Regions:
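A conserved FAD-binding loop/helix module that cradles the flavin
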Residues: 389-391, 509-511, 517, 523-559
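A Rossmann-like FAD-binding core segment of flavoenzymes
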Residues: 289-335, 340-342, 396-507, 550-559
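Beta1-alpha1 glycine-rich phosphate/pyrophosphate-binding loop at the start
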Residues: 150, 154-181, 187, 234-301, ...
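A short, hydrophobic beta-strand/beta-hairpin element that forms part of a small beta-sheet core
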Residues: 196-205
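Short, well-ordered coil/turn residues at beta-beta hairpins
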Residues: 201, 236, 335, 341-342, ...
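Cytosolic regulatory regions built on CNB/CRP/Popeye-like sensor folds
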Residues: 1-152, 156-164
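Glycine-rich dinucleotide-binding loop and its adjacent helix/turn
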Residues: 211-230, 342-398, 496, 509
């Protein structure tokens, strides 16, 4: 998944393309059905729903990549003992490459649900399969192979917007500058005034699409009606939500996960997390989230990402125990429990013209895409929490200088000691205590070209020619979708749980992570009083599953 360490394809080819022996294939056979394909027939096509995993029994299948501009690139030729799939086939997502029979081909087709069952039932074989599926996706991402083609100026805010969206969702893409490619230039001219075109693998051409429109074109989300009753709907796919999904699905509960943008939440944008248990050398937030995302799907959790939740109906919670979630497209999901894991977003400080420069020099995350923009430049970063510290250290490897602005006297009250030590030891990071961002300069069309910050004790102002400012300030809970459903929140909008939320329970107190509505739980940053750390969020996400079981058991016995 995204942000894994770079893959040397040749050195890891044996892991990416392992050859199954006769015993392996015999173990797989009970999960699939044999399929025959005549010469030159297509087994799967990029942009169309993938049928699952193929195991080649006889013949050879050519794997190629089509970029939507008429270019076809060979990737591999797979013969007997090879299996054809990447990680998207755990959920039957659209294929990223084409597969054609080079002569008569006999295969064993394992559909997505049976692929998940195989991985769990045959643990040692499943480990090899999952490793290969993940490595193949990462290799496609690193190569810029497959996926949509973004045609436009590489420094365009809209190009960067879609790059960030695709990267955060672990989806490969390729950017083409029309000034350097005749075919792209001709296509851009054909669409008149379009400043950005996206060519999807299925051939569809989108003009400066929204993230939702692009996701639908790529088949990242379905449009099916989900009439079944879920055991758990998880709203939010950050560390807390993904932990809930992994543990709930692994224990046999019917789980669906929703997020309006991508998996990983704020933590997914962290360049490196070094104090998470079990990773002594650290791990990027994207890699940690990506592994959890795959893990949840392995156990059968469904993912609807990106999908925006607009409201929740709790009117039946006390009677039938049924809750209803309404999505932005009008679809509804029914569930016996809901876990609110929608997190918090960074606050937008009251700085004049801030909105003019969002995506044009003002950033709320620091990924490799933004780091490239800062090469050998002076930048500003506002915030004193762990996310700010991780971003400062990461950006210092690219920028000439990183100015860290904090309102307080130091970082000690809000940042982990290991990050403070690292910042103090980094010569091109300068801490500005008692300081706040006060002004932004530039043209919205061309972007930010300078900023002003002020010492709030003395009123002294300083101008800096920073073209990029990173904001990691405060936290505003993502809870507007809860309006009107009876879930109690504190004065800042964070969800109350446990004893403070027990007013809605006439017969019993609310459980530790339960809200004021029976069967509605809250975990992670969105919960009032939670520890705003990745480890704490994951712990709450795991712990809530036991409370869900208790609630479902009680609902069953009283029905």
């Amino acid at each position: 998944m995204p942000n894994e360490a770079p893959i040397e394809v040749e050195t890891r080819r044996h892991q990416m393309f392992p050859v199954l022996n006769a015993a392996d294939i015999a173990r797989i056979a009970r999960f699939g059905t044999q399929r025959h394909y005549p010469a030159d027939s297509c087994l799967f096509r990029a942009g169309e729903p993938g049928p699952g995993m193929y195991v080649v029994l006889k013949g050879v299948v050519a794997i190629t990549q089509r970029d939507g501009l008429g270019n076809v690139t060979p990737i591999a030729e797979q013969g007997p003992g090879h299996f054809l799939a990447e990680v998207g086939q755990l959920s039957g997502h659209a294929a990223l490459v084409d597969g054609h029979a080079m002569g008569e081909v006999e295969t064993l087709l394992v559909p997505p649900d049976q692929l998940r069952a195989l991985i769990i039932a045959e643990a040692d074989l499943g480990e090899r399969l999952v490793r290969a599926l993940i490595l193949r996706r990462v290799a496609l991402i690193e190569a810029g192979a497959s996926g949509p083609v973004l045609i436009g100026p590489p420094d365009s805010p809209d190009v960067r917007r879609l790059q960030n969206f695709l990267s955060r969702n672990g989806y490969p893409y390729h950017v083409v500058d029309a000034t350097q490619d005749a075919d792209a230039a001709a296509l851009l001219e054909q669409y008149g005034e379009a400043r950005l075109l996206v060519v999807c693998p299925n051939g569809a051409v989108l003009m400066n699409p929204t993230e939702d429109a692009l996701a639908r074109c790529l088949g990242m989300i379905d449009s099916e009606e989900h009439a079944e009753l879920f055991d758990v709907v998880v709203v939010g796919a950050g560390p807390a939500g993904l932990a809930t999904a992994v543990y709930a699905a692994s224990e046999g509960l019917r789980v669906i996960v929703l997020d309006c943008r991508s998996y990983g939440g704020q933590a997914g944008a962290s360049a490196r997390i070094e104090n998470y248990l079990g990773f002594p050398t650290g791990i990027s937030g994207g890699a940690l989230a990506g592994r959890a995302y795959v893990q949840a799907q392995k156990f059968g959790a469904e993912m609807l990402i990106p999908t925006k939740v607009v409201s929740m109906d709790c009117s039946k919670a006390h009677r039938s125990g049924e809750l209803s979630i309404t999505l932005e497209d009008g679809r509804q999901l029914r569930s016996r429990t809901v876990v609110i894991a929608s997190g918090a977003r960074y606050r937008r400080p009251a700085v004049p013209r801030l909105a003019d420069f969002e995506g044009r020099g003002i950033w709320f995350w620091a990924s490799a895409l933004e780091a490239k923009l800062c090469a050998q430049q002076e930048v500003g970063l506002v915030g004193g929490g762990n996310s700010a510290g991780q971003a400062a250290v990461f950006l210092s490897q690219h920028a000439a200088k990183v100015n860290v602005l904090v309102r307080g006297p130091s970082l000690a009250a809000s940042m982990s000691r290991y990050l403070i030590d690292r910042i103090e030891a980094t010569p091109n990071i300068e801490l500005h205590p008692h300081t706040e961002l006060s002004g932004l300069h530039g043209d919205p069309e061309t972007g930010l070209n300078g900023a002003t910050w002020r010492d709030h004790r003395t009123g002294t102002e300083h101008d800096c020619a920073a073209r990029n400012i990173f904001l990691f300030v405060g936290a505003e809970p993502e809870t507007t979708w809860l309006d009107g459903c009876g879930v109690a929140v504190d004065r800042h909008g964070f969800v109350l749980t446990g004893q403070p939320a027990s007013g809605g329970f006439p017969a019993r107190p609310a459980a530790a992570l339960e809200s004021s509505v029976p069967g509605v739980f809250a975990v992670g940053d969105v919960r009032s009083g939670s520890v705003k750390r990745v480890g704490g969020a994951i712990g709450e996400g795991a712990a809530v599953v036991a409370l869900i079981h208790q609630h479902l058991s009680g609902a069953t016995t009283t029905a």
